[in-house]
Structure formats: structure tokens, C-alpha cells
């Protein structure tokens, strides 16, 4: 082979090698089909309704200390038409609801008494302990260890009854609007004095049956009928001693009497 041909062959080989090296250094870019963006798993924002009003039969408490039981009975009657709102049932529920509190009914006792009778219940609260009940226990000369033991027992019973609890620092009237807008009836802790200036300041439970742009509509077991409170007044009434508790019952979960 002539020197000229050898030289030309070397040039060809050199060019091939260079192209091969470039191909290794810069691989061809593959076209990959884009996957659709995954949707956020965050819960959808609830759109508040302009107005909501549940038809909830009113039941007045028969004793100064049974507001929790009276409220539970009103809610249970709404989700279970067979439920009988009688004084005997009021006492039976109060004996459960009072556990974990001094006398008015704890959030766990109240939630458990509804769940035990078939309700689907959720607690919305800003506290994880006995809260104001410790102060009441000292005032009423109730043993704190006994109170704590009872409180823990009812918490466990509530969990066993599938009661869900959500802690939040922002329990507000919007929390109640959201509950009503999603078909939940709220039983709300308030200061009794905020509704009735003739009553001493004390923890008291009420049923909120609805709202509109002007007011909230409340079944107060201490009164004989539904009362109305404008938004500002209701906001001021919420909670007791900076403790805010709302017991929510899902109205879509209807309770039916078991066939024998």
C-alpha cells in the first residue's frame, strides 16, 4: 500500500475515533414523555354555605348540671328517629358524660355517650389535658388524681368507640360554619353567663343548629326554645376559660334500630 493511501486511511480512522469519542462524551438526549403532575394530597378547602339550618327537636335540661346530656339527646334524636328523649335517658347519658369533668360533662364523656349510641363523632379542641376542670376541681374540693384517672379512662373509651380528635389552636365561629356546611351538628362549649347574664360564669353546652348572614341559631338546653345570637355575640360566647371544645356528629351517618 502506498504511503499516500496509508496516510488517507489513518485520517479516516482518526475521524471515526473522534466521532466515537464525542458520541460517548455527549450521548444523545432521549425524549421522555412527561408524567402528569401528581395532585396535592392536601384536603380540599371547604366552601362555607351562605346559610344552613337543621331541624333539631329541642330538649330542655331538667337539672342545672345536665346540659351535656340534653345536647347529646337532641343530636341523637336527629340521627336516630327511634331515640326517645326521656328524663331517664338524660340521667343515663349524664352519668357517662360527667366522667372526666367535675359536674358539667367532659369532651370525652360527651363524645363517648353519643358514639356509644351509634353516632359518628369527632372532637375539635384546643387542649390536650383536663384544662379548666382542674381549677373547678380545686374549687369544688374534688381530688385531682381521681379527676385525671377518670379523664384518661374516658379518653381511652372514646378512642375505642372510634371517636376522632383534632387539636387546633384556632377554634372559631368559622370552625362551626365549616362543620354545619359539611353536614355535622356541633355541640359547643360556652360560658353560661354569655347567654344569660343572670347565670354565674360556668361551663355550659349548647347545640348549634344553623346560621345565616345575620345570626347563629342555637338550641340552648337551659331555655325552652331556639335562640338567636348575632355573629359577634356568638364569637364572644365561645369557650370557657380559654378552653374551646366542639363535639361534631355526622348527620349523614343515620342510626337505625337493630332488628331483633
Feature locations, PLM:
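Active-site-adjacent structural segments surrounding the nucleophilic cysteine of cysteine proteases
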Residues: 2-149, 153-160, 169-170, 199, ...
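Noncatalytic regulatory segments and standalone regulatory/sensor domains
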Residues: 98, 180-181, 187, 191-260
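Short amphipathic alpha-helical surface micro-motifs
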Residues: 103-105, 167-171, 189, 226-231
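Short amphipathic alpha-helical segments and helix-helix/interface helices
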Residues: 110-111, 173-177, 235
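Internal catalytic-core helix/loop-beta-alpha segment
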Residues: 149-190
Amino acid at each position: 500500500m502506498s504511503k499516500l493511501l496509508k496516510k488517507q486511511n489513518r485520517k479516516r480512522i482518526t475521524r471515526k475515533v473522534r466521532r466515537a469519542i464525542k458520541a460517548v462524551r455527549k450521548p444523545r438526549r432521549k425524549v421522555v414523555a412527561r408524567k402528569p403532575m401528581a395532585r396535592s394530597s392536601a384536603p380540599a378547602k371547604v366552601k362555607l354555605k351562605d346559610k344552613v339550618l337543621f331541624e333539631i327537636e329541642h330538649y330542655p335540661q331538667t337539672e342545672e348540671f345536665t346540659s351535656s346530656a340534653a345536647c347529646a339527646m337532641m343530636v341523637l334524636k336527629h340521627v336516630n328517629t327511634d331515640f326517645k328523649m326521656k328524663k331517664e335517658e338524660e340521667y343515663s347519658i349524664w352519668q357517662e358524660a360527667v366522667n372526666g369533668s367535675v359536674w358539667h360533662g367532659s369532651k370525652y364523656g360527651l363524645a363517648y355517650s353519643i358514639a356509644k349510641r351509634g353516632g359518628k363523632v369527632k372532637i375539635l379542641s384546643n387542649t390536650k389535658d383536663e384544662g379548666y376542670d382542674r381549677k373547678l376541681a380545686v374549687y369544688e374540693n374534688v381530688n385531682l388524681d381521681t379527676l385525671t384517672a377518670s379523664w384518661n379512662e374516658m379518653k381511652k373509651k372514646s378512642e375505642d368507640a372510634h371517636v376522632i380528635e383534632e387539636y387546633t389552636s384556632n377554634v372559631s365561629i368559622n370552625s362551626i360554619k365549616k362543620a354545619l356546611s359539611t353536614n355535622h351538628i356541633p355541640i359547643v362549649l360556652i360560658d353560661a353567663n354569655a347567654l344569660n347574664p343572670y347565670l354565674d360564669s360556668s361551663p355550659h353546652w349548647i347545640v348549634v343548629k344553623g346560621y345565616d348572614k345575620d345570626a347563629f341559631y342555637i338550641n340552648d338546653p337551659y331555655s325552652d326554645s331556639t335562640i338567636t345570637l348575632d355573629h359577634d355575640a356568638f364569637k364572644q360566647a365561645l369557650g370557657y376559660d380559654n378552653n374551646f371544645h366542639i363535639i361534631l356528629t355526622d348527620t349523614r351517618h343515620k342510626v337505625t334500630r337493630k332488628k331483633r
